């Protein structure tokens, strides 16, 4: 089961917004991770995507986006969760996907998902026993396989469960138990989180994640010499989407100096002009609705549209090429 590819698809689609340059504003709900969840996330985070599941369920635009980008593997997980006794429409409140490196000098990436809510743990465990599901024991925790999804799950407590491959879950438990450093010691990512975690959908990326994302966003414009010059200045990024009163997207890239931010802004504007030359009507409208600016060592991208325009955008060739 290629959960890493699933994460790439989700993160790309959520940031498609940025890439398409296509999602926030304040909201009644916020997708915030609990302290228990944060303490189990590995230090070497490359990207986190966190979603308020209640907001998603109540937004036609959010559900349309979900339908377009949800990979089959996660649909299998959803089915497996329901069969285990969980009701994702009732029990699930927040959902997060964590892409991380297995070491500070490694490019080997692994992914875990975190679900938060009020879970009927006793009922779920009773169902596992009834089905004679064999658990993998790691110290005081038990990892349970989730049917044909290829993923397994471990419950940190009654409100937090983590799913992924068994090797990744073992690493997460090592982090939770203090055997490996956690997200809490990653100052740059924690700073980025404080800028966005009051939003219903948000993502933060570290230096490597930011440089990879911006290379994808810029497309052919990333091949120019200026990009190589400023790439090393891209130290972090974060974006949010909000589905109340249409769709809104905000992306910020931290460069640390004004010259680098202005250069990336110019490259991004050039990429927008290039895309307008061949884009569909809905794509051109989306690009017209996008503003790009830089200030104080930071690049900012803002996009806002109506639900109906966003629906048309999801069907556009540019969107399809980015999520398939």
Question: Model-flagged regions — what are they?
Answer:
Residues 152-214:
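A conserved glycine-rich beta-strand in the N-terminal activation segment of trypsin-fold
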Residues 24-30:
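Sec/Tat signal peptide C-region and signal peptidase I cleavage site
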Residues 42, 104-107, 156, 242-246:
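Edge/loop elements at the starts and ends of beta-strands within beta-rich repeat scaffolds
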Residues 13-23:
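Bacterial N-terminal signal peptides
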Residues 232-259:
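Internal helical hairpin/lid segments
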Residues 49, 146-178, 246, 291-310:
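A short, solvent-exposed beta-edge/loop patch
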Residues 2-15:
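Bacterial N-terminal signal peptides that target proteins for export
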Residues 30-147, 189-229, 266-293, 298-300, ...:
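Structural boundary/hinge residues at secondary-structure and domain interfaces
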């Amino acid at each position: 089961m290629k959960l890493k590819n699933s994460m790439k698809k989700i993160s790309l689609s959520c940031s498609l917004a940025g890439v398409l340059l296509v999602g926030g504003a304040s909201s009644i709900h916020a997708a915030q991770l609990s302290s228990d969840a944060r303490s189990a996330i590995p230090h070497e985070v490359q990207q986190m995507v966190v979603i308020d599941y209640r907001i998603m369920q109540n937004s036609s635009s959010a559900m349309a986006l979900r339908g377009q980008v949800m990979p089959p593997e996660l649909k299998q997980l959803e089915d497996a969760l329901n069969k285990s006794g969980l009701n994702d429409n009732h029990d699930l409140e927040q959902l997060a996907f964590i892409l991380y490196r297995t070491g500070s000098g490694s490019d080997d990436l692994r992914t875990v998902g975190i679900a938060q809510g009020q879970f009927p743990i006793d009922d779920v465990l009773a169902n596992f026993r009834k089905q004679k599901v064999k658990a993998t024991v790691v110290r005081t925790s038990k990892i349970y396989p989730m049917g044909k999804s290829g993923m397994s799950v471990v419950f940190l407590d009654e409100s937090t469960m983590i799913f992924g491959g068994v090797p990744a879950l073992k690493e997460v438990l090592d982090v939770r138990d203090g055997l490996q450093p956690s997200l809490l010691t990653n100052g740059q990512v924690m700073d980025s989180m404080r800028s966005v975690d009051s939003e219903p959908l948000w993502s933060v990326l570290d230096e490597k994640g930011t440089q990879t994302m911006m290379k994808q966003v810029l497309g052919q414009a990333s091949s120019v010499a200026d990009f190589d010059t400023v790439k090393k200045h891209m130290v972090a990024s974060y974006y949010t989407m909000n589905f109340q009163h249409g769709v809104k997207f905000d992306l910020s890239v931290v460069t640390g100096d004004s010259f680098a931010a202005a250069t990336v802004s110019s490259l991004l504007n050039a990429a927008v002009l290039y895309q307008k030359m061949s884009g569909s009507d809905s794509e051109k409208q989306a690009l017209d609705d996008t503003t790009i600016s830089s200030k104080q060592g930071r690049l900012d991208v803002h996009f806002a549209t109506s639900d109906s325009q966003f629906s048309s955008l999801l069907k556009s060739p540019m969107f399809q090429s980015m999520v398939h």
